[in-house]
Amino acid sequence: MLDSVASKPELAELLTLTKTEQILRLAQINVELEQLSAQERVKWALENLEGEFAVSSSFGIQAAVMLHLVTQQKPDIPIILTDTGYLFAETYQFIDQLKAQLNLNLKVYRAKESANWQEARYGKLWEQGIEGIEKYNKINKVEPMRRALREQNVGTWFSGLRREQSQSRAGLPILSIQNGVFKFLPVIDWTNKDVHYYLEEHGLSYHPLWEQGYLSVGDTHTSRKWEPGMSEEETRFFGLKRECGLHEDDGSEQDGSGI
């Protein structure tokens, strides 16, 4: 698959190019990746992209799909969770459930300051508008994830982002480069129906809060149940933003666009 597009050494060379050069070189590969199934995409990535590999997961509503999809081909792949300390009790229970069911190699990373210490220093950042939310996300999600990628020596990062989830994800490619790491999104073009059928076929569950009306689940204080007329992205961060920062490039010219 895709052998005519780029060899493994040629793919590795992409990491040395500027962002613009990376995007141009990756465009042709992405055209062909779009023609493959999610399982074929994962197989290609494991055979051709830079290791070590890892999957990031928030253990959200549809998390079981990506965790199952990738561990079927690489059972021992590290699963990185950034634990803010403010997850729902049901999320922690879901983590334990999937860890046992799929025998996950779970790696948990947290902020260097505890949740209580952060509140003592900064107050409740999530109540301080967009700037407070961005600071909260940087402390609790972005820094721990970058530390995880560094400590796990990750060369290729798998994520379960889907274009259908929000406008900010609608144009994402399957393969990109984010902050010097290959970013691979094998289910980026899946619909909610595709997700549902996969879960049913493989005996997997939605997050427990799915049945209570949640379409997206993160921290307790910035996740809302869906109500008629709301988009999925409006159920997070009070509708002020969709992304927590994990899947945003740092903006440097050397790194490609990117969980």
Swiss-Prot record:
Pathway assigned to this chain's UniProt record: Sulfur metabolism; hydrogen sulfide biosynthesis; sulfite from sulfate: step 3/3
Main subcellular localisation: cytoplasm
Keyword Oxidoreductase: yes
Keywords: Cytoplasm, Oxidoreductase
Enzyme Commission number, as recorded: 1.8.4.8
Family of the protein in this entry: Belongs to the PAPS reductase family. CysH subfamily.
HAMAP family: CysH
Role according to the record: Catalyzes the formation of sulfite from phosphoadenosine 5'-phosphosulfate (PAPS) using thioredoxin as an electron donor.
Protein name per UniProt: Phosphoadenosine 5'-phosphosulfate reductase
Organism of provenance: Vibrio campbellii (strain ATCC BAA-1116)
